[in-house]
Amino acid sequence: IFFMEQTKSLIEAIIQGIQEKKGKEITTVDLHHIVTAPCSCFVICTCGSPQQVSAVCDSVEEFTRKLVQQKPSAIAGRQNGLWVAMDYGTVMVHIFLEEARGYYELEKLWDDAELTQYPDID
């Protein structure tokens, strides 16, 4: 995946934050070459409960603040526990409850996007 160093470090911090709270099915969607895409990359993960969605969101915030000194410009959906979207400018984080991820299938929106899957950590 081609990303500027700063974006790469941000993605790594996001993934660590997700893994810290046992987020599953972590996938990055490389959108940097797609003109109509809203950002360079999506980081998507699945959670088993609304409480875990919230915990992963908090963890991602903590890890990005500590490791790369970045805060999201916006966080949407925090109250509902189904789908939280975190906007880091070049990177958007999508934290889904299992049913919501299956329903929205964000990974499939761009056919020519490169997907990278990360192993689940137990």
Give short role names for the model-derived ranges.
Residues F2-C39, C47-V84, E98-A100, L109-D122:
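Polybasic/polar functional segments that serve as interface/processing modules
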Residues Y103-Y104:
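Glycine/threonine-rich flexible loop motifs
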Residues S40, T90:
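Conserved acidic residues
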